Amino acid sequence: MAKSRPLQRSTALRSHAFPASQHPAPALGMSSDKALLPLGALMLAASMGAAAQGSAPETTMSTVTVKETAEIQGKDTLLLKKTTVGKGKQDIKDIPQSVTVFTEKLMADRNQDDFREVLRTTAGVTFLAGETGEEDVRLRGFSLGQAGDIYIDGMKDAPLIERDTFNHDRVEVLKGSASMLFGKGSTGGVVNQVNKAPLLIDQHEAAYTFGTGNSHRATGDFNFVTGENAAFRLNAMVQEADNYGAKQDKRGIAPTFAWGIGTRDEFSIGLYYLESKGRPTYNHPWRLSADGKINTTLPARNFYGLESDYTNTSSQYATLGHIHRFDDGGELNTRLRYGTYERDMLASTIGFQNSAITLGQINDSTVLTRYGSKGRMGESDVLQVQSDYSNTFNWGGKKHAVLTGVDYYDDDAKRNQNYANTT
């Protein structure tokens, strides 16, 4: 037993305790078997324990099912159940007012390329000719432009500009008092244009449309996935038309990049540019009939103006967005937008050379003349900051929704007085 202690130590520290010449000694060989017995017993016990564990029955966890409604694109459906016409995403059924949503698919099926064409099919919407040629959109009799009730992604849009649907995912119309959801505005309603956003799927689409009046229009919608939660989307449009002298040429492009899509913090940056050059139809010569009613005997399809008439508009803005999602389901949506909007118009006022001419005297030889012109120039530099917080919670056995936020809007407008001349 006196020898077993140093021999056990030499097994663990063999390379340090003995020279190499002493390893073949018989005493070392005889004692090594005894020294390894405890190690062999330990290995046998470990193998028996492993076998016992392997024979234990497996425990199967119960199946967990997770359900969530997929985000639906405007181009995939004619009907949407949610809207962002307010300061957050809501179910249409929860808004105690009439809401109409025009999805991208619906606008494409109807071939509605212009903002006015979309609204023209909405009950309660009418159009009046403005003093400087633009159309005044009215909802339930109230002017949307004058009240500032036209929005883009929930942020106020500039008035007196040309609009197009090439970058629209949908157009939402809320009828009724706008103050319920926006805290301002008229009692007519609100129109909200929702721009297309990057998606986590590669998809590309191009379209070409042609028609009478030398009308040609080409659009492109391209979406690229650039990372695990990042994507880039580009929309572009070119349109040309010359309908009996009333020309219109439009160019538009809208790139958007987003990262962190669907995560706790989502960021986006987008640019938008739309340029429109046209020749307006400012007025139509007319005469009063014997009973005092306005009578337009000249064909409406003709262009009553001069080749030098023009209406040029441009819209360009950049938008930065950030969405923070809290653990309790709350969401803080912050947007910063800066844009420049320009409008330059010169239109002729056309009438009969003989101001005393009667309806019975009008024929193919009747001479028309230009009585004067109407013009307007304007430029607006707009800065907007908007931050909205929304959340839902249960209290008192009922579900409640919280919606609050801040909104800053600064419009530095430079406009001349409406000018007119008779030369």
Which residue ranges define each predicted feature?
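Outer-membrane beta-barrel translocator/receptor signature
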Residues: N167-D169, M180-P255, I261-E266, Q316
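Acidic, small-polar-rich N-terminal luminal/periplasmic segments of exported/outer-membrane proteins
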Residues: K3, S62-I201
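Repeated loop/turn-to-beta-strand initiation elements of outer-membrane beta-barrel proteins
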Residues: N229-F232, R264-I269, G329-L332, G397
